[in-house]
Amino acid sequence: MIKNFDPYRDRQARLIRNSLSTAFVQSLKDRNPAAFAATAELLLRQDISADKKAYILDRLARYRECITTIEQQGVQTILEQSFVLWDAQLFFEVHEILEGLWLTAQGREKAALQGLIRAAGVYILLAAGNRQGAEKMAAKSVQALEENGAALAYFPSSRQLLTSLRNLVPSPPKLRG
C-alpha cells in the first residue's frame, strides 16, 4: 500500500481507487488498455498529492504488466484473469472482476467465488492494518473455499492459499506459480 493513500478515510483516494479499478475491469473486457490509461491520465491532471500520484503510477504499471501477461499467456477466462491480478497483488481489482462472475453464478460455484473475493479482502484489510477484520474474513473465506473450491473450473495453488489464510500469512501467496 502506498504510504498515506487511504481509500477508507480519504474520499478522493477512494474515488481514485474506484475509478481506476472500474476502468481496468473495462480494459480487461475490451482486451485494450485504453480505458485505464485514459482514466489515469485524467486523474494525473488533477491537483492531487504526491501519494495519490504514486498510487496511480503504481497501478498503471501493474495494470500494464497484467494486460501483457494475459495477452502473452493467452489467459481467456475472467477466473483465470483474476489469478493474474492476484499475483500482481491487485486485490481490490480481484474483488471487482470476480464480483461480476459471482452475481451470475449459482450454488457451490457462487460460494467458492465468494470465498475468493473474501480472500482478496483479507489482504486488503491486512494492508490497511485491520488484522482483526482480516482474521474474521479469512475464517469465512477458508470455510467457503474448503467446502466449495472444487466447483471452480480453475483454482491453482488452492492448498497454498488456504494455508496462508488459516495462518493469516501477511505476504500473499503467488497462485499461478
Model-derived segments and their meaning:
Residues 123-126, 136:
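Extended alpha-helical scaffolding segments
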Residues 74-75, 107, 111-114:
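Residues that mark the junctions of alpha-helical repeat units in TPR/alpha-solenoid scaffolds
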Residues 1-93, 100-104, 147-177:
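N-terminal alpha-helical interaction modules that lie
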Residues 130-149:
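TPR/TPR-like (Sel1-like) alpha-helical repeat modules
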Residues 98-99, 118-119:
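Hydrophobic, membrane-inserted alpha-helices
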